[in-house]
Amino acid sequence: MQQVLQEPLIHWALRSFLAALFATAALSKLTGMEEFHGVVRNFRLLPDMASRAVAMVLPVAELAVAAGLMIPALAAPAALAAAALLGVFGLAIAVNVLRGRTQIDCGCFRNGMKQRISWAMVARNAVLTAMALGAAALLPAARPGGTADLATGMLAGSVLFLLYFSASMLGGLPARHPSTASVKGR
């Protein structure tokens, strides 16, 4: 097991997945700043002025984390920053679920798809936080890797991200109700 945890391919896959997650989230927020400000404000955790500041700074911080994860010298602190951000996001979601405000959008990706918050989303963030903490903890033990490890790890991380993002997109689709479903083909 120890050899698996030291495998550079594992580290690059984990870092690439997290970097893609943060870069995509940041870029989607930067393209819809006003909408994202509304999402932050809708969580009702900060005063309006602070909500605007957070909405402006958060995508930049997410881009910095994404870049840091891909730079070996910065990967460990970037992974810790990723864990901190994911933990705060999970806490903000949990507070609103406890308040019964599950109809609000999480604001994870500003792709036109609304993702209502839930305990499942809190659990998802806990898993992502654990992944980021794992990346930070395992980095010092990683064996040096070659170009093949880097390329394969980045490809694996990208595929994992595409699967994750696809599942998120599908989760944001409105449910079809039997009463509104098409009867085509019958």
Curated annotation (Swiss-Prot):
Example GO BP: methylamine metabolic process
Q: Which GO cellular component terms are attached?
A: plasma membrane
Membrane topology field = Multi-pass membrane protein
Its principal location? membrane
Which keywords does the record carry? Cell membrane, Membrane, Transmembrane, Transmembrane helix
The pathway entry for this protein reads as: One-carbon metabolism; methylamine degradation
| ATP-binding is among the record's keywords | no
Is Transferase tagged as a keyword?
A: no
Show the stretches that span the lipid bilayer. Answer: 8-28, 54-74, 75-95, 119-139, 153-173
Q: Tell where it localizes.
A: Cell membrane
Q: What does this protein do?
A: May be specifically involved in the processing, transport, and/or maturation of the MADH beta-subunit.
UniProt protein name? Methylamine utilization protein MauE
Q: What is the lineage of its organism?
A: Bacteria, Pseudomonadati, Pseudomonadota, Alphaproteobacteria, Rhodobacterales
